[in-house]
From Swiss-Prot:
The keyword Hydrolase does not apply. The lineage of its organism: Eukaryota, Metazoa, Chordata, Craniata, Vertebrata. This is Cytochrome c oxidase subunit 2. Signal peptide: none annotated. The chain crosses the membrane at residues 15-45, 60-87. Its cofactor is Cu cation. Component of the cytochrome c oxidase, the last enzyme in the mitochondrial electron transport chain which drives oxidative phosphorylation. The respiratory chain contains 3 multisubunit complexes succinate dehydrogenase (complex II, CII), ubiquinol-cytochrome c oxidoreductase (cytochrome b-c1 complex, complex III, CIII) and cytochrome c oxidase (complex IV, CIV), that cooperate to transfer electrons derived from NADH and succinate to molecular oxygen, creating an electrochemical gradient over the inner membrane that drives transmembrane transport and the ATP synthase. Residues 1-14, 88-227 are mitochondrial intermembrane. It comes from the Eukaryota.
Length: 227
């Protein structure tokens, strides 16, 4: 999860998030090199006194500063397209869980476990225990297995929401009347936090998401939910 004064991304808990972090570093390096080059050119222009009134054109330079940015954009676009494909790929998920957004809570439905349905509300500050996170804890966590592809079917009952867990690299819109899906494979057990990432009304800031990831063998023993 995030930490105070954290500057980077959260630690990855899925292969897709690992790819996103790698792409972030790749794009940031390209941006840094371009910025340094532009700053060097500006500094040289401001400090030099040399002029040449005989130069009317420089076709070689024009070709270079046209082709070079195009190459840089291609090098950035190719890994971006690959990650975009990975996020949309659905390949034989082991479990399907449905998430329904409401104003302002989430409903989860485990279709593979007899249609188990429960709501997940944010815990008010009066019900928090020492060490709990304000505005992030819920009464019922969504329990998910690790090391198995899980498909999340996401929709909304009223307005536009967005189901997001940054450490898993997940952000899928919950659209009324439409069923969106995303597939992920978690790699580490733990408790991970997210929030609705689409402004959905007065209490938009008070509908957190808490995913508890447990080993697959424990998950397969049956529902382990505390309701």
């Amino acid at each position: 999860m995030a930490h105070p004064v954290q500057l980077g991304l959260q630690d990855a808990t899925s292969p897709v998030m690992e790819e996103l972090i790698t792409f972030h570093d790749h794009a940031l390096m390209a941006m840094s090199l371009i910025s340094l080059l532009v700053l060097y050119a500006l500094f040289s222009t401001l400090t030099t006194k040399l002029t040449n009134t005989n130069i009317t054109d420089a076709q070689e330079m024009e070709i270079i500063w046209t082709i070079l940015p195009a190459i840089i954009l291609v090098l950035i676009a190719l890994p971006s397209l690959r990650i975009l494909y990975l996020t949309d790929e659905v390949n034989n998920p082991s479990f399907t869980i449905k998430s329904i957004g409401h104003q302002w809570y989430w409903t989860y439905e485990y279709t593979d476990y007899g249609g188990l349905i429960f709501n997940s509300y944010m815990l008010p500050p009066l019900f928090l225990n020492p060490g709990d996170l304000r505005l992030l804890e819920v009464d019922n966590r969504v329990v998910l297995p690790i090391e198995a592809p899980v498909r999340m079917m996401i929709t909304s009952q009223d307005v536009l929401h967005s189901w997001t867990i940054p450490t898993l690299g997940l952000k899928t819109d919950a659209v009324p009347g439409r069923l969106n899906q995303t597939v992920f494979t978690a790699t580490r057990p733990g408790v991970y936090y997210g929030q609705c990432s689409e402004i959905c009304g007065a209490n938009h800031s008070f509908m957190p998401i808490v995913a508890e990831l447990i080993p697959l063998k424990i998950f397969e023993m049956g529902p382990v939910f505390t309701l």
